[in-house]
C-alpha cells in the first residue's frame, strides 16, 4: 500500500514538473506583460501601460485587421472550394480518390518555406508576364488601358492563404462523406427532391461537422501563419505574425507580451466554453442511458450546450466586431508610400503625424538585415518605395543601378543635413540618399563582471572571460573586430589578412571564449547580467542602460566602425512624389528630435543634434548626461579612429561567406 502511495505521489510530482515546463514560459510572458519597464528580464514594477499602448499602436492594430480579414475571407473561400472538391473526390473511384488524396496531402507535409518561396516566384513570373502582355495590348489600342505593373499585396496574400487552407478542409470533409450512407441521396430524390434540394437538405447536414472542423483548422492555420505570408504579402499588407516578428528585431517589446497574453486568454476562454459544452453533452448522454436502462421516462432538460453555443457565438461576434471597429481603416487611398526600415527604428507617432498632415497613407514594414532586404528586393518579392539600408548596402544598390536619383528641390530639409554626412563614399555626389541616423559599433561590458575598464578589442578574444563573451552574429562585424585587433582595416580585401582574422576568431570560438553568437538576444543577456562582454551598437547600449546601470560602453583604442543609415528610393517606384515628401518630413528638425529620443541614435540633422540636450530636458524633465550624449554622438576625434564600411568586391564577399561557413556559427 505504501509503495502504491509513493508511486502516486511520484506520478503527481512528475506530471506537475511536466506542466511547469510547458507553461512556465507562458507564465513569465504574462507576468512581464505587466512590467512597468521595457526589459523582458528586469522587473520594474506593476503597470498596465503596455496594454494601453497596444491599443494605440497603429502597426499592431492594422496588422490585426489584416490578419482577421485575410483569415476570414480565406477560410470562407477554402471552406467552399474544399467542400466541393471533397464531394468531387467522393464521386471518384477508390483508386483515383487515393491518388488525388495523396496529392492533396503534399501541401500539408511540405515545408512552409518551400510553399512560400514557390508562391512568391509564381506571382513574380505572372506579374512579369502580365507586364509584357499589358504593354503589348496598350501599344496597339487605347480604348482600354491595362495596368502594366502588378505587385504583391493583400490580393496575393489572400490567394496564398486560400491555397494552403483548401487541403485542410478536404481532409476534414472527406471522412464525413465516406461515413454517409449513399442511399440517403437516392431516397431523398425518390421522395421528390431535386438533386440540389437533396444536396442542401441531406448532404450538407451530414457533412456539416467536417466543414466546421475544416474551417476552424483553416482559420487557425491562417491566423498563425508567418512564413508563407512573409513571402507573399508584398509591401501593402502585414499580418500580426509578420508585425510581431518585425518588432523582435531589436528586442522583445513589452507590447508583444501584452498581445500574446490576450491571445492566450482568448484561446483559454474558448477552450473552457468547448469543454463545458462537451461536459454537458456527456452528462445528458449519461442521464439518457440511465433512464433507458431503468425504463423511466426521460426528462426534457433545457439544452445547456445550445445555450453555451449561442453565448459563445455572441461573444465571438462581439469581439470580432469590436476588433474590426478598433482596427479597421480604409484600405483605399489616393496617395500611399511604402517604407521599409529596421525594427523599432522610428517613433510611430511620426507616421501618424505625417498621414494627418499630408493625407498620404504609410505602409511601414521592417527587414531583418541589409542582406535580407537586398534578397527580397532582388527576388521581386517587395514593392517598397523608400528603404533605409546601411552605408555598404547603399553602395551596392547604387552600383547595381537599383536606386532612383532624387530631386533635392523637393527635399528642402536636405539642407539641414550636416556636411559631415554628405558626399560619403557610398554616394559621393549626393544623388541618391538622405542620411537618416548614424552611430558606432563598440564593446558593451558589465563593470561588475570584468577586472577593470575595457579599452581594446583584445577583450573579445581573451580566454580569462571564457563563456562570458557575446560575439555579434554578423560576418562583417565579427571579422571587423578581429581585423581591428590585428591592426588591419575593416575594408581590407587582402585574403591573407582576412584569413588571419578568421584564425583569431576561430581560435576564440574553439577555446570556449564565446558564450554565443547573438543579435537580438544580447538585450536579455546583458540586461540580466548573464554575460560580461558583448560587441554591439552604441544606440542599443543606451537602451540596455535603462535596465542595467552596471553596463558600460567603449569604442576601443584600435578604432571601430561608424555607420550611416540613409533613406533612398527604389528605381521602379510608382510613388516618387510621395517618397520624396516622406523623406523631407523625416529629415526635418522636429522629426529628428523625436526620433533621437526614441531610438537613441544620433541625427545627421545639425540643428537636431545641437538642440537635443535641451529637447531631452524638456521632454523628460531632467538633464541629459553629457557622457550619454557623447556615446550617442561621439566627437570628431573619436570618429577619426573609425571607418565606414565600403562595398567590397564580389570576390571578397564570397570569401567572407566561405569563412563564415567554416566558422560554423
Q: Model regions: which residues?
A:
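Membrane-interfacial helix termini and adjacent extracytoplasmic/periplasmic loops
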Residues: 39, 48, 113-162, 196, ...
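C-terminal transmembrane helix and the adjacent membrane-cytosol boundary/short C-terminal tail
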Residues: 4-13, 93, 174-185, 189, ...
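Short membrane-interfacial helix/loop motifs at transmembrane-helix boundaries
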Residues: 3, 24-58, 230-235, 283
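Interhelical loop and adjacent transmembrane-helix boundary motif
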Residues: 3-8, 51-59, 223-280
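Transmembrane-helix boundary motif in ABC transporter permease subunits
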Residues: 1-8, 73-104, 117-125, 199, ...
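Transmembrane alpha-helices
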Residues: 14, 19-26, 110, 163-174, ...
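Glycine/proline-centered hinge or cleavage motifs at structural transition points of membrane proteins
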Residues: 191-192, 205, 437, 441
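Early extracytoplasmic/lumenal segment of secretory-pathway proteins
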Residues: 329-397, 524
Amino acid at each position: 500500500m505504501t509503495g502504491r502511495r509513493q508511486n502516486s505521489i511520484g506520478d503527481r510530482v512528475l506530471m506537475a514538473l511536466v506542466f511547469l515546463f510547458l507553461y512556465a514560459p507562458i507564465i513569465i510572458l504574462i507576468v512581464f506583460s505587466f512590467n512597468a519597464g521595457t526589459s523582458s528580464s528586469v522587473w520594474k514594477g506593476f503597470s498596465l501601460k503596455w496594454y494601453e499602448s497596444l491599443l494605440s499602436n497603429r502597426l499592431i492594430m492594422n496588422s490585426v485587421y489584416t490578419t482577421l480579414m485575410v483569415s476570414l475571407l480565406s477560410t470562407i473561400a477554402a471552406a467552399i472550394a474544399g467542400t466541393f472538391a471533397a464531394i468531387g473526390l467522393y464521386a471518384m473511384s477508390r483508386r483515383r480518390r487515393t491518388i488525388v488524396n495523396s496529392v492533396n496531402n503534399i501541401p500539408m507535409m511540405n515545408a512552409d518555406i518551400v510553399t512560400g518561396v514557390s508562391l512568391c516566384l509564381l506571382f513574380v513570373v505572372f506579374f512579369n508576364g502580365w507586364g509584357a502582355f499589358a504593354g503589348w495590348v496598350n501599344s496597339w489600342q487605347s480604348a482600354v488601358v491595362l495596368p502594366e505593373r502588378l505587385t504583391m499585396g493583400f490580393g496575393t496574400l489572400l490567394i496564398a492563404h486560400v491555397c494552403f487552407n483548401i487541403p485542410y478542409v478536404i481532409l476534414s470533409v472527406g471522412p464525413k462523406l465516406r461515413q454517409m450512407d449513399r442511399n440517403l441521396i437516392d431516397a431523398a430524390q425518390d421522395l421528390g427532391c431535386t438533386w440540389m434540394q437533396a444536396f442542401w437538405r441531406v448532404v450538407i447536414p451530414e457533412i456539416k461537422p467536417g466543414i466546421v472542423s475544416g474551417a476552424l483548422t483553416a482559420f487557425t492555420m491562417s491566423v498563425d501563419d508567418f512564413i508563407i505570408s512573409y513571402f507573399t504579402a508584398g509591401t501593402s499588407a502585414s499580418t500580426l505574425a509578420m508585425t510581431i516578428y518585425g518588432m523582435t528585431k531589436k528586442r522583445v517589446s513589452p507590447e508583444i507580451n501584452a498581445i500574446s497574453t490576450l491571445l492566450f486568454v482568448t484561446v483559454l476562454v474558448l477552450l473552457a466554453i468547448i469543454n463545458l459544452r462537451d461536459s454537458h453533452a456527456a452528462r445528458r448522454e449519461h442521464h439518457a442511458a440511465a433512464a433507458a436502462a431503468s425504463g423511466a421516462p426521460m426528462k426534457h432538460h433545457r439544452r445547456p450546450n445550445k445555450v453555451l453555443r449561442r453565448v459563445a457565438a455572441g461573444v465571438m461576434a462581439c469581439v470580432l466586431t469590436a476588433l474590426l471597429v478598433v482596427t479597421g481603416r480604409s484600405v483605399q487611398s489616393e496617395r500611399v508610400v511604402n517604407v521599409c526600415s529596421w525594427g523599432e527604428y522610428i517613433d510611430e507617432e511620426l507616421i501618424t503625424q505625417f498621414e494627418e498632415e499630408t493625407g498620404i497613407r504609410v505602409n511601414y514594414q521592417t527587414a531583418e538585415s541589409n542582406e535580407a532586404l537586398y534578397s527580397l528586393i532582388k527576388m521581386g518579392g517587395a514593392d517598397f518605395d523608400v528603404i533605409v539600408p546601411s552605408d555598404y548596402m547603399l553602395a551596392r544598390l547604387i552600383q547595381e543601378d537599383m536606386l532612383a536619383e532624387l530631386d533635392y528641390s523637393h527635399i528642402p530639409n536636405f539642407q539641414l543635413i550636416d556636411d559631415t554626412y554628405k558626399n560619403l563614399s557610398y554616394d559621393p555626389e549626393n544623388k541618391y540618399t538622405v542620411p537618416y541616423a548614424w552611430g558606432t559599433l563598440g564593446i558593451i561590458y558589465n563593470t561588475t563582471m570584468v577586472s577593470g575598464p575595457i579599452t581594446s578589442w583584445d577583450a573579445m578574444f581573451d580566454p580569462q572571460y571564457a563563456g562570458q563573451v557575446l560575439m555579434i552574429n554578423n560576418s562583417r562585424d565579427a571579422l571587423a573586430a578581429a581585423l581591428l585587433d590585428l591592426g588591419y582595416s575593416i575594408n581590407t580585401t587582402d585574403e591573407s589578412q582576412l584569413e588571419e582574422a578568421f584564425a583569431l576568431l576561430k581560435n576564440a570560438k574553439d577555446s570556449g571564449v564565446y558564450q554565443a553568437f547573438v543579435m537580438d538576444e544580447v538585450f536579455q543577456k546583458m540586461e540580466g547580467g548573464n554575460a560580461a562582454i558583448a560587441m554591439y551598437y552604441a544606440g542599443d547600449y543606451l537602451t540596455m542602460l535603462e535596465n542595467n546601470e552596471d553596463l558600460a560602453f567603449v569604442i576601443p583604442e584600435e578604432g571601430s566602425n561608424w555607420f550611416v543609415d540613409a533613406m533612398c528610393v527604389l528605381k521602379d517606384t510608382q510613388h516618387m512624389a510621395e517618397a520624396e515628401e516622406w523623406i523631407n518630413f523625416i529629415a526635418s528638425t522636429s522629426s529628428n528630435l523625436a526620433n533621437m529620443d526614441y531610438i537613441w541614435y544620433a541625427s545627421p540633422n545639425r540643428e537636431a543634434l545641437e538642440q537635443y540636450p535641451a529637447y531631452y530636458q524638456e521632454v523628460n524633465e531632467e538633464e541629459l548626461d553629457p557622457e550619454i550624449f557623447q556615446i550617442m554622438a561621439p566627437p570628431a576625434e573619436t570618429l577619426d579612429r573609425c571607418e565606414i564600411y565600403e562595398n567590397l568586391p564580389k570576390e571578397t564577399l564570397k570569401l567572407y561567406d566561405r569563412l563564415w561557413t567554416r566558422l560554423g556559427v
